[in-house]
């Protein structure tokens, strides 16, 4: 078996980028939102692993949901209407303060705004999106 490791960026994942891999004279088109794909190459398996290069505060769960941990000062958000969670891909994510609770750690979900879900029947299908889950840590 041959194993190739690719390190896509977060923007690659959110943009549904497909990488063209040239291996032993053959071209393989790798959808970067998959974590592992198997191809046949000259009677052997070619395994392509996608291990994203992510910031420390971001992880990806088994359902391709993005988990983004952010920290905000409780005192600072009292005067704001919304908090900016950052720009991911081409979208900026803003959470209305009115939807937050008075608790130290909470989650806020942007449904169907994340990475493409894995379709085992069509690996290039990018029509269904995962969620982006912000884990908000409030501190003094």
Question: Where are the regions a protein language model picked out?
Answer:
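Post-J-domain flank of DnaJ/Hsp40 co-chaperones
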Residues: 1-14
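Intrinsically disordered, low-complexity linker/assembly segments
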Residues: 12-140
């Amino acid at each position: 078996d041959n194993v190739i490791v690719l390190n896509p960026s977060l923007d690659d994942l959110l943009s549904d980028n497909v990488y063209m891999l040239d291996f032993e004279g053959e071209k393989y088109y790798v959808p970067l939102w998959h974590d592992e794909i198997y191809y046949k190459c000259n009677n052997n398996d070619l395994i392509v692993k996608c291990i994203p290069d992510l910031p420390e505060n971001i992880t990806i769960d088994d359902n391709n949901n993005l988990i983004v941990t952010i920290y905000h000062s409780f005192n600072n958000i009292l005067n704001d209407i919304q908090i900016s969670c950052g720009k991911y891909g081409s979208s900026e994510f803003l959470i209305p303060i009115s939807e937050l609770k008075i608790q130290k750690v909470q989650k806020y979900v942007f449904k169907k705004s994340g990475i493409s879900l894995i379709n085992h029947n069509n690996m290039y299908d990018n029509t269904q999106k995962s969620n982006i889950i912000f884990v908000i840590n409030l501190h003094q």
